[in-house]
Amino acid sequence: MSAAAPALVSIGDHGVLNAQLTPAQADVWIDRDMSWLDFNQRVLAEALDERTPLLERAKFLAIFSSNLDEFFMKRMAILQQGQTKEERSLLQTLRERLLPQLQQQADCYRNIIVPRLEEHGILLRRWDDLTPAQQEEAGLYFDANISPALTPLVIDPAHPFPFLSNLSSSLVFELRHPGHTEFMYARVKVPTVLKQWVPLEHDVPAGKKLFVPLYEVICGNASKLYNGMELGPATLVRLTRDAEVEMEEDPDEGLREQVQAQIRQRRYEPVIRLEFGPGADLAVRETLRERFKLTPLDLYDLPEDLDYTTLFELAFLPIPELRDAAWVPLVPPALDDEDPAAIFSIIQSGDILVHHPYESFDASVERFIRAAADDPQTVSIKMTAYRIGDDTPFVKSLIRAAEHGKQVACVMEIKARFDEERNLHWAAELERVGAHVTFGVSGLKTHGKTALVVRKEAGGLRSYVHIGTGNYHVKTARLYADFGLLTCNPLITRDVVNLFHYLTGHATAPQCSTLLVAPLTMRLRLLELIKREIENKRAGLPARIVAKMNQLEDLDMIQALCEASAAGVPIDLIIRGFCCLKPGVAGHTENIRVRSIIGRFLEHSRVFHFANGKENPLEGDFFIGSADWMFRNLSKRVEVVTPILVAGLKEKLWQFLDICLKDSRQAWVLGSDGTYKQLRPAPDQLGTQQTVMNLTLESVQ
């Protein structure tokens, strides 16, 4: 065991806490933020991977940047507020890890994406590369489609410094009157509401398409915005603001009003990052740095002046040979009945486990709520809503149900970051038709994915439930891989009824004998399940833990896993994102293996298996639910995890976990040195997601 001094650990949602690690804990601990950068490196690796279709590679460059934006808004914002030497050192270390990734991203775009797209007839050009005819065409496009949306500004004593919104890109110029040496700054915001890639047709060979970035077209026509003035070279700058605004709930003020005030305040939060394109004017850099009270560590000089999130626009060009083969989610065989109301009798005949996006979200979860809204036997519908999107069929179904006189209750999480305004809107729409809308439990976010339908049947009232690992969001249901359970088993439905009483009323704690509910029982129950595996191993009984989740960070859970490993319990962890546990450390985690699976779908499901003394995995315990093993999930959120009680559904989960553990195409393995290595199989080796697609096709044939 190392004799190192206790270390500071980056833990939790709201800052770098002075949590002291013991020497043993420090030996197996990986910093959360460093591990997150490793995760985003794995995303970038998909763009660098020759096996990935070309437009998908462009999409992964965009995902890499989008992820990084959120990382800065949430995590780097916290670190920048830190005052200790350790926190400042971590900022420097994170920056040093990030800079080579940014160079890799730029090299991939410039040396791979652009020339390879050209080979396939997609020409990406800069303004200076255009022919005179193309520049004239772009100028006409600018006059008709861009200029009316622009607001050219100057900064001088008569014009105050303009507001720069979060994640906005701006072009900054030196502006002079002809014959004068004095200059002022001019600023033009690049609008996000317009197409970010301008298509041109002049001098383009037949069968090819040519695009120019929007900011290049603006830059090439900027003189029209400042007619009669002299413009210097443009500096492209992109700004990121702090989004980690922690609201302390005021019991004397309504939560809705507090959230609305928080949304307004977020626009004006401190700037935490400035990104500059190549050749940025040094005076502009220094002016902005001083204006926003930043240090040199907060400025990033990028190798390429492109905002890579704009590549999402190109990634969906209709060129099938450059994209993943289209996947249309299939109707689960158990739900292959054209009568919408038949879903309730189908659930009565047995629990159903659906796996999205392989199996249809519309034909299962949406259908469940839609049928309940239209069914005259439905008495009530209750749902949690964390992220539900813009054009949500779920709210439409709830509105229709309320208009039909059914009792409708929705626990709307209006503190879901970046979805607050959307959720406030849907809350108002539901209240308008008389639905009961509550905002959950004071001080907690409601993150569980649960729906309850109560019907009047011959024998009395019967409850039906959906519990999932993913949001009630039709868009992400096509992009995220998640599980959901449909059941009318009273062992589960009774708990869900009590859970909603807790969420909508003032019960101190729901009576839940089957479900694991955070922050009330989940942490304790999970620790008990791990302890049981330790006891079984010591008693000579079969013991094993397989846990799949998005991230692992909670210190209690990591400590319990270390104790299980030390007792000889084999542990397999499938963790897509950051993992704060280092496997394979002698005396601590030598029986723990960690892998991460990255692919076309975001692996979002949380699945837990405990052998429970049984040699046959199908006789062990299985759970699915909404919670990762993070401090915030187990202590600061309402989360729901359900056991899977039916043998056939356990088999489906075990088959999936087994596929994940055997994957040598999409998997990365975490070593005892804290670094990930990508497995490299034969070229025709299938990964987890393609294997599940094939199995899903077989199941309906």
What are these regions (language model features)?
Residues 1-545, 563-567, 579-601, 605-701:
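N-terminal localization/anchoring segments of enzymes in phospholipid and broader phosphate metabolism
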Residues 550:
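Cofactor-pocket helix-loop regions in the catalytic cores of large enzyme subunits
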Residues 555-558, 562:
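Glycine/threonine-rich ATP-lid/beta-loop region of ATP-binding domains
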Residues 570-574:
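Hydrophobic alpha/beta core scaffold segments
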